[in-house]
Design a protein with these regions (language model features):
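Iron-associated oxidoreductase/ferritin-like identity signal
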Residues: 1-134
């Protein structure tokens, strides 16, 4: 995989998704997608437990129509931040009302923070230890 660092704006651009890192990156993305489906299933079960009916609608998709790895990872970072905020909201609402929902929110927060960390590390320039910032 080739990449370019743009010192003027501090951005790091991945130019393609081929080469030595293609298979691990594709595998990682597939694994995250499968995990996301598992999260959706758990959430649906909780909605049903609470007497509701899970929606089959899909929310807004964060598609930029750009398909290099850097763009995909930045989209993933945005998605992880949104999920993290939603789970913090759920935790705040459920605290003192439902131990089950509190624990679900905490479990999801741990997983989302770990995902956020993984994506952040992948977006850093080689050798960079500071967190990625756009």
């Amino acid at each position: 995989m080739t990449s370019t660092f743009h010192p003027a704006n501090g951005s790091f651009e991945f130019l393609d998704s081929t080469g030595y890192n293609r298979i691990p990156i594709v595998s990682w993305l597939k694994s995250n997608a499968q995990e996301g489906l598992g999260h959706a299933h758990k959430a649906g079960e909780l909605v049903t437990l609470l007497g509701g009916h899970p929606s089959l609608k899909i929310g807004a998709l964060l598609e930029t129509e750009k398909h290099d790895i850097g763009d995909i990872l930045r989209e993933s970072l945005e998605h992880e931040n949104g999920a993290l905020a939603a789970y913090y909201d759920l935790l705040k609402i459920s605290e003192g009302n439902s131990v089950l929902l509190e624990e679900f929110a905490r479990e999801m927060l741990v997983q989302e923070e770990l995902h956020l960390d993984e994506v952040n590390k992948m977006l850093r320039r080689p050798g960079e230890i500071e967190p990625f910032k756009e």
